[in-house]
């Protein structure tokens, strides 16, 4: 099991506390769930952090180590690989490709869907082509600049990272130009409604819902930040979320394993913001929310074609990051 941030992905660079905290939450929850299953689990950890519990072996990554060689060596030892990594700079795509080349079973999405969902512009185009409601996405060259609230986001960013919001087009353009974001960022109009997310498991064009969640997003000095949410805080929208998740699964059929979908709910319309082809922070509350071991559900869905999806509890769980 590889969690990029805590597992040594930044071993030769500064380790931001917020990223390490969020990564550790996902890592520890997944390791706990995997430890309840009949597998030996190996992982890696940045030398600046404590060795995690619930693993059979942990390789420590120091600042002078080649972390990619370490991961490649561990992948060679494994029968299956669970990857948690940001889409930014192609990191998740590269790790997934590495695991595939070593012949390991990747308990996650395929390369094609990772490539599309890693880029906001490509995601928008794929969703629009499939007739799925989404937020129109522009570059600085084709942006309409109408009177509205606008957001600038990294085209390949994850979550709220480096995302700015301004009440008028001129201020947003000034921010983009002053911070040299012309080539890295795309522009979206602010979409009114309730920020939410879908946690689900996908395989071969079919989606199974784990939970329907609210998201807590803060805006401070024009910059967005993610603070957590409520697992199943949107359970009244289960049927609508399930429909959207299955539409996405059909549009991108090699989405596999855990997939997180960020959405806006506006007067019962579900508008897709982005697709996360990997574990999201919502995973930390899923064991309590579902009454099941989510890691077991993911593995059985991917490895047992006739696996019958069980009835899940829909408990409400608060979490913060």
Residue spans of the language-model regions?
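Nucleotide-activated donor-dependent transferases that construct or modify glycoconjugates
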Residues: 1-19
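Conserved N-proximal alpha/beta basic substrate-recognition cap immediately N-terminal to
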Residues: 42-145
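Cysteine/selenocysteine-centered motifs that mediate thiol-based redox chemistry or coordinate metal-sulfur cofactors
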Residues: 305-321
